[in-house]
């Protein structure tokens, strides 16, 4: 079970890094917000889901 939590945290860190880099680049690029809005919202939803799933799985570990 511990390896699952470690894997989830690793995925969360990688995904967070991608969002931290990708979202400001999207905002800084002219016209990209309209094209990438759905992708950013989807990414934020996936990130939120990862946080909740990681917390839920972690609650089963002593």
Swiss-Prot record:
Organism encoding this protein: Gracilaria tenuistipitata var. liui
Annotated Gene Ontology cellular component terms: chloroplast thylakoid membrane; photosystem II reaction center
Record has Membrane as a keyword: yes
Membrane topology type: Multi-pass membrane protein
Family: Belongs to the PsbZ family.
Lineage: Eukaryota, Rhodophyta, Florideophyceae, Rhodymeniophycidae, Gracilariales
Protein name, per record: Photosystem II reaction center protein Z
Function in brief: May control the interaction of photosystem II (PSII) cores with the light-harvesting antenna, regulates electron flow through the 2 photosystem reaction centers. PSII is a light-driven water plastoquinone oxidoreductase, using light energy to abstract electrons from H(2)O, generating a proton gradient subsequently used for ATP formation.
Main location: plastid
